[in-house]
UniProtKB/Swiss-Prot annotation:
GO BP terms, alphabetized: response to nickel cation
HAMAP family listed in its UniProt record: NikR (MF_00476)
Quaternary organization: Homotetramer.
Role: Transcriptional repressor of the nikABCDE operon. Is active in the presence of excessive concentrations of intracellular nickel.
Keyword Metal-binding: yes
Protein name: Nickel-responsive regulator
UniProt-recorded Gene Ontology molecular function terms: DNA binding; DNA-binding transcription factor activity; nickel cation binding
Cofactor (UniProt): Ni(2+)
Presence of the UniProt keyword Transcription regulation in the record: yes
InterPro entries assigned to the protein according to its UniProt record, in alphabetical order: Acetolactate_synth/TF_NikR_C, ACT-like_dom_sf, Arc_rbn_hlx_hlx, CopG, CopG/NikR_regulator, Ni_resp_reg_NikR, Nickel_NikR_proteobac, Ribbon_hlx_hlx
Family listed: Belongs to the transcriptional regulatory CopG/NikR family.
Cofactor, how bound (note): Binds 1 nickel ion per subunit.
Length: 132
């Protein structure tokens, strides 16, 4: 591990200290390491450098919408090679929450997630991508 020195303006340091307290970091170093990891991960995603990933796709949908449940199930089966696991939750009489764990090439995971989120009556779709 290397020790470095940085200069941060007072307002930014105050905001960082608030975040450290709220999130319960033991020290500033660990908080800055996490921020650096997150920034590097985001940059590699934007630049297309991340070859393989694990993705967490979460979305809600109206299960009573005509054939939607069947379409979503077929989509998962059609991509069985990247769909590792799914959790299904009944939110109320009409709405369900699906959380899917995906593992593959980053482009394939994004394509799958985009396809699911584009279905009519699928709402609040979010994909979190983690590097492998």
């Amino acid at each position: 591990m290397q020790r470095i020195t940085i200069t941060i303006d007072d307002d930014l340091m105050a905001a960082l200290d608030r975040m450290i307290e709220i999130k319960g970091y033991q020290n500033r170093s660990e908080a800055l390491r996490d921020l650096a990891r997150t920034g590097l991960q985001q940059a590699s995603l934007e630049e297309g450098q991340m070859e393989a990933c694990v993705g967490v796709l979460s979305y809600t949908y109206d299960h009573s919408a005509r054939d939607l449940s069947k379409k979503l199930t077929n989509t998962h089966h059609d991509h069985h090679n990247i769909s590792v696991a799914s959790m299904h939750v009944h939110l109320d009489h009409d709405r369900c929450l699906e959380v899917s764990i995906l593992k593959s090439k980053t482009d394939d995971v994004r394509h799958f997630a985009d396809h699911v989120k584009a279905e009519r009556h699928v709402t609040h779709g979010t994909l979190a991508v983690l590097p492998l």
